[in-house]
Each structure stands twice: as C-alpha cells, then as structure tokens.
Amino acid sequence: MADDDVAALVVDNGSGMCKAGFAGDDAPRAVFPSIVGRPRHQGVMVGMGQKDSYVGDEAQSKRGILTLKYPIEHGIVTNWDDMEKIWHHTFYNELRVAPEEHPVLLTEAPLNPKANREKMTQIMFETFNSPAMYVAIQAVLSLYASGRTTGIVLDSGDGVSHTVPIYEGYALPHAIIRLDLAGRDLTDYMMKILTERGYSFTTTAEREIVRDIKEKLAYVALDFEQEMQTAVTSSSLEKSYELPDGQVITIGNERFRCPETLFQPAFIGMESAGIHETTYNSIMKCDVDIRKDLYANTVLSGGTTMFPGIADRMQKEISSLAPPTMKIKIIAPPERKYSVWIGGSILASLSTFQQMWISKQEYDESGPSIVHRKCF
C-alpha cells in the first residue's frame, strides 16, 4: 500500500453532482455538476480554441449553446466516455493531482449492476494508473459520517434513492430497497407543473433553471391536503423567482406539490411506495430484534433530503406505520448533502482501512472482478 504521507482521494460521483477531495478533510474541495456539454452549433470564430466538450461548471455556464448530458442515470454510469471526461476533469482541473500518485476511494449505489463497478475499477487502473482504489456503498458512508454503526439510512440524491439498514457496521443486503425516484424526477415534475401555469421549460438548459427553483423554493408540507387548502385561500405561500432574462415568475402550491412526489410517487405515474413507506418496508425486512434500533436511528442523507419540513413529515408518516409505543427518531444532519463524501473521507483515513485497498498489483493478477471480493 502507498506510503502514509500520500493523501487518498475521495470521489463521490453522484448522478447530479460530483463531490471530490482529500481523505481527512471535513468537506469536499470540489463540488460540480456531473454534466458533459457539447456545442449545439457550428463554431465560426477561428482561433477561439473552442472545445468539443465541456465538463461541470463550465458546461453549466455555457449551457445556452450546449446540449447537456448526465453520464450517470439512476446511480448507474450509462456513458463511460463521458464518465472518463468527468474523472479526468476531477483529477486534473478540480483537485489538480496526478491520479497515479494517490489511492482513490469511489462510491456507488447499492444494488448496482456488477459490471458497473468492474468497469469503474478497470478505468481507474488502466486509464488513470491509480496505485490503489476501493468502491464503497454510499449509504454506508453516510452512516459513518453520522458517527453511528447501527441505523437505517435513507439516501436520496439526484438519480436514485435507497434505504439501507445497517447493524453493527454490517449492511443487510436482503433488506435494502432501491427506489428509482429522486431529485431529477422532482425537477422533471416541477417542469411539468410549471408548464400548467403557462411557463414553458423544455431544453436541457432550462431544466437547470427549474432545478434551481426547486432547490431554493420547494418544501415538504406536514399535511398535504391542508396545505393545498391554504394555497387556495391565501397567497401567503406564493414566492417569486427571477429568471436569467429578468422575467419574474410566481410559484405557489408547486412549492410543496413537487417534493410531495417523494411521499406519493403516483404523482408522476410511478407505482411504488413513497420514501416513508419504503423506509418502513425496509425495516420490516430486518430481524424483529433489531427493528427498534433502526426506528430510533433513521438517518437522512443526500441532496434530495434537504427540503425544509422533510424530517418532520418522515417522523409523522413513520409513526403512523410503526407500532404505537415505538420510539422513532429521524436524524437529519445539516451537512447531509455531503455526508456520503464526509463518510468516505473518514473511512479512507482510518488506519484499519489501509489493508482494504485494492492495489494495482492485485488488479493485475486478478482483473476487474477483484472488486467484488475486496469491496462489500
């Protein structure tokens, strides 16, 4: 294993945002959108040094002339060429490190296809010549970050949500439930319901505007029906938002109708339980003896759990499903947007973790399948 003085890199490749930095730090150094943009138009200015692709914030700032693509959908990498561009950008432009000098810890969603992590492993060793690497499960890292070894994590990002029960540090794979409903679906739904108001958002660039509206103004209602009544009778819930061209739009009940989808997936035509019921179902798949500990340690993680009011609503919904005397505690750490990364930073800097890395030598001997043996 590499010498102790070389900091490991921690890269949490989310469907929406990539969080990257150095093990031992308390926050990621680089947070940028997991976007690759390609020009929609013909370049006419000679000598401008136009690129054929842009990554992250640069793609975001030039979005008016680009087609934006997300290479990670529902937590699974669907475009490896673009993914390589994102990693290249992470190492060389954001962190400014030589990847062949640092071990790298990557993250992935539970219940991902095996081929996905094999390919990640292969690219790290063959394209970037990493000396060592490891792939960790996102939700497990969030629990590390909250300082617990037992609990159930509801991790909801941009592309995928999942509930992962963990007991004394062991994830219980039979009880993990994956829900392909997350931030991006909420953004799409917000685009749809704003269209009903007469505001048209259609392009990939406009989707980013709607995502911003969602992040700034949406919240979870404690009682949806009652909130709808309030919205009808008073304008107290209305907020205005200024679009990049200076036009001001007003949004009212969309503010809480959008995230309500998390609790009522039928809003977007999904036949699935909401996040509260999924969490409950996940707990019920666990041994009867450990359920009490899970109810009392329900940890929220990921950007889509950042809506104001979500913890209170979860508390209310799970209380109505659980046995009446059960103590239920929803833990919503303020830094939960980055708790996967923070957990990775903690894990990669533990002395006991150093023998867990997959080294280049092991990879050369066994090939990409080594990742299933060495990583949970």
UniProtKB/Swiss-Prot annotation:
GO terms for cellular component: cytoplasm; cytoskeleton. GO terms for molecular function: ATP binding; hydrolase activity. The keyword Nucleotide-binding applies. It is found in: Cytoplasm, Cytoskeleton. It comes from the Eukaryota. Disulfide bonds: none annotated. It catalyses: ATP + H2O = ADP + phosphate + H(+). Keywords: ATP-binding, Cytoplasm, Cytoskeleton, Hydrolase, Nucleotide-binding. Its EC number is 3.6.4.-. Its main location: cytoplasm. Belongs to the actin family. There are at least six actin genes in Podocoryne carnea. Actins are highly conserved proteins that are involved in various types of cell motility and are ubiquitously expressed in all eukaryotic cells. This is Actin-3.
